[in-house]
Amino acid sequence: MKVRTSVKPICDKCKVIKRNGIVRIICTNPKHKQRQG
């Protein structure tokens, strides 16, 4: 899980999800997991 100010999808399988006001990226590749913070 990477915590970044600007989250961007890295590959085609990355999905942007908003949960409780937190922007997250979920992917099949665990390295691509990100959240805004």
Swiss-Prot record:
Q: Which Pfam families match?
A: Ribosomal_L36 (PF00444)
Give the family this protein belongs to, as stated in its UniProt record: Belongs to the bacterial ribosomal protein bL36 family.
Keyword check for Ribosomal protein: yes
- Spell out the molecular function terms from Gene Ontology: structural constituent of ribosome
State the disulfide connectivity.
none
> What PANTHER family is this protein classified in?
50S RIBOSOMAL PROTEIN L36, CHLOROPLASTIC, LARGE RIBOSOMAL SUBUNIT PROTEIN BL36C
The biological processes this protein is annotated with in GO are: translation
Record protein name field = Large ribosomal subunit protein bL36
Q: Cite the entry's keywords alphabetically.
A: Ribonucleoprotein, Ribosomal protein
A single Gene Ontology CC term: ribonucleoprotein complex
Q: Extract the HAMAP family matched here.
A: Ribosomal_bL36 (MF_00251)
Native organism is Treponema denticola (strain ATCC 35405 / DSM 14222 / CIP 103919 / JCM 8153 / KCTC 15104)
What SUPFAM superfamilies does the record point to? Ribosomal protein L36
Q: What's the superkingdom here?
A: Bacteria
